[in-house]
Curated annotation (Swiss-Prot):
Pfam families: UreF (PF01730)
Cell location: Cytoplasm
Family, per entry: Belongs to the UreF family.
UniProt protein name: Urease accessory protein UreF
A cellular-component GO term for this protein: cytoplasm
């Protein structure tokens, strides 16, 4: 019996590259951003794991979890001359000055590291746009890229809440495990979406992100 391993090896290589790019250890400074959750917690609107799960579910389904995925997929599929337009849309979709900083600074840090190691030339792009272009340049599968990106996004929100609420590490991991089916669902939806499908409906979090800009005492940059 002949065993074909080429697809398995290629898939493993893609998985390892993406987990490196989107791990907490990759130098994009993700640990410094709470996406507005610091203000939510400071106001007393998130006190336990159940509230955390509710907030992150909304963000994934109706906020940046979906819009970032759509932007990533659009940049992955785009012709080179269309990338700057997608990046401009990504900046416009950031709902506060700090959110712009969050996506622009992480995108710049990501591009700097990937360009240095994988010999790409990504330029100055917002984070999801940079990830999409890098994945395309390296021939990484879009579906896997979206799943791991969305998981990393959710994991960073959970990590911020674990530190701020505070919650136990096990509680945080239980929330992340419970979010796995939704993460896969959002990634699949973004895979087939186009730039015209961009929408957001996380007004409470957007307002919290705006208030965070003038919050007196804060740990996170956003």
């Amino acid at each position: 019996m002949t065993i074909h391993t080429s697809r398995i090896i290629m898939s493993t290589d893609a998985f390892l590259t993406l987990t490196q790019w989107l791990s907490p250890g990759f130098p994009v400074g993700a640990y410094a951003y709470s996406h507005g959750l610091e203000q939510v917690i400071d106001c007393g609107d998130m006190r336990d794991a159940k509230a955390l799960q509710d907030w992150v579910e909304d963000i994934l389904e109706h906020g940046s979890g979906t819009s970032d995925g759509i932007l990533l997929a659009a940049s992955y599929k785009a012709l080179p001359e269309d990338v700057s337009r997608i990046d401009a849309i990504a900046r416009a979709f950031a709902s506060s000055a700090e959110r712009v900083t969050e996506t622009v600074d992480q995108g710049a840090a990501f591009a700097k590291a990937v360009d240095a190691i994988w010999a790409t030339d990504l330029g100055q792009l917002c984070y999801p746009v940079a990830v999409g272009r890098a994945a395309c340049a390296q021939g990484l599968p879009l579906d896997l890229t979206l799943e791991i990106y969305t998981h990393a996004f959710a994991a960073n929100l959970v990590s911020a809440a674990v530190r701020l609420v505070p919650l136990g590490q096990t509680e945080g991991q239980a929330v992340l495990a419970a979010l796995a089916p939704l993460i896969r669902q959002v990634a699949r939806r973004c895979h087939d979406a186009g730039i015209d499908d961009l929408t957001t409906a996380c007004m409470a979090l957007d307002i919290a992100a705006m208030h965070h800009e003038t919050q007196y005492s804060k740990v996170f940059r956003t």
